[in-house]
């Protein structure tokens, strides 16, 4: 049995013995809306709907695997402190957007090969939904202590959505809000 460093996250409720956080809800909602957007886009652009359905089936596990793997490689100290089993503790958080992107690109490549459709058409169909999922996950980051920037020292800028209360009570830039708004605008 591996020993894991305990990380605190506010749970909204428990489902099947697992804590469910606000971030997890936002991310799940984003993925569901993203999949629906991709299916709708496939129908409107005459892209193969089966390919649009295959993409998330491949993309979700591949993005989780590669996102976690790259995070653990970049956070080797956490891996060494907590043991090899830490890689499999995705409920502790920690994913690399670079790794997730690798997983998504691989899923698009596999979808194109399996369904015999264009790789670029696959991306064209999937990207708006992926951006929506990114936007909602970044909005959800507001429920965590992540996604913040430097301390805001100008009192006139110490309000939401520009700033948020940091880990130690200081006012910090809410970087996650900017990321979320850019992704949301790009998605629509």
Where are these regions (language model features)?
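A feature for loop-to-transmembrane-helix boundaries and adjacent hydrophobic helices
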Residues: 1-188
């Amino acid at each position: 049995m591996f020993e894991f460093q305990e990380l605190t996250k506010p749970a909204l409720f428990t489902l099947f013995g697992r804590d469910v956080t606000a971030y997890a809800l936002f991310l799940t909602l984003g993925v569901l809306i993203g999949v629906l957007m991709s299916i709708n886009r496939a129908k409107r652009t005459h892209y193969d709907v089966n390919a649009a359905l295959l993409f998330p089936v491949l993309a979700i596990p591949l993005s989780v695997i590669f996102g976690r793997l790259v995070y653990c490689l970049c956070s080797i100290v956490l891996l060494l402190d907590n043991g090899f089993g830490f890689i499999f503790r995705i409920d502790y958080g920690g994913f690399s957007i670079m790794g997730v992107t690798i997983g998504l690109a691989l899923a698009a490549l596999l979808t194109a090969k399996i369904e015999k459709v264009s790789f670029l058409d696959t991306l064209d169909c999937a990207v708006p939904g992926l951006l929506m999922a990114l936007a909602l996950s970044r909005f959800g980051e507001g429920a965590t202590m992540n996604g913040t920037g430097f301390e805001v020292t100008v009192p006139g800028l110490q309000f939401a959505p520009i700033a948020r209360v940091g880990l130690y009570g200081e006012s910090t830039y809410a970087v996650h809000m900017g990321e979320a708004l850019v992704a949301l605008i790009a998605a629509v």
